[in-house]
Amino acid sequence: AQASAGAPPEPAPAAAPDSAAIRVARSVTPSQVDPSLQSGFNQFNAGNVEGARRSYGEVLARDANNRDALLGMAAIAQKQSQFEQAQLTYQRLLELDPNDADAIAGLASVRPADPGQTESRLRRALQRTPDAAPVLFTLGNLYAQQRRWAEAQQAYFRAYTAAPGNADYAFNLAVGLDRMNQGKLALTYYQRALALARDGIGNFNQDAVRTRIAELGGQ
């Protein structure tokens, strides 16, 4: 289906982390999840950035190398446009594990670099971990910045397939499809993104999405 009148929105520049305590909670029993880590994740997604910072800080006071808490701190810095601090935190994570897909994706999203070098770095990370959703999402954004929409849409689709509960992944997939004039499919994923973002988790303008849904013939 062809897109209706009106311009598709721009992709979300960064995704709310499908990370930290929630990934831990998927792999271990809830009683084993650090309460401060879970609190940090919940507060970040509720918009309480300072509360999240305190909770992650409690974890790091006990374990300075805690990966999930460091990722949380990096996400906070990025959300507050403290890009230098975010970069330092991602670099710290890469010192702990040079192959950390989340850190590779995070660093690529906050540090200006040659697009070709960034693409190569992200592709190398995907060779090691083909289903690394944050890397796929960041690669999609890199393609989108260059208006390589077919490649962006494919990367967003792979990111969404790997993490279908992430509102930002669904939104950017919708944008990619929209830019490819696949309005009917785009509508489905815009609606999915809104449904996933009902709890406030999402780095996109929900009113703009509702407007675009109406333009595409949705309710």
PLM features per residue range, with description:
Residues A69, A103, V135, Y169, ...:
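TPR alpha-solenoid repeat register
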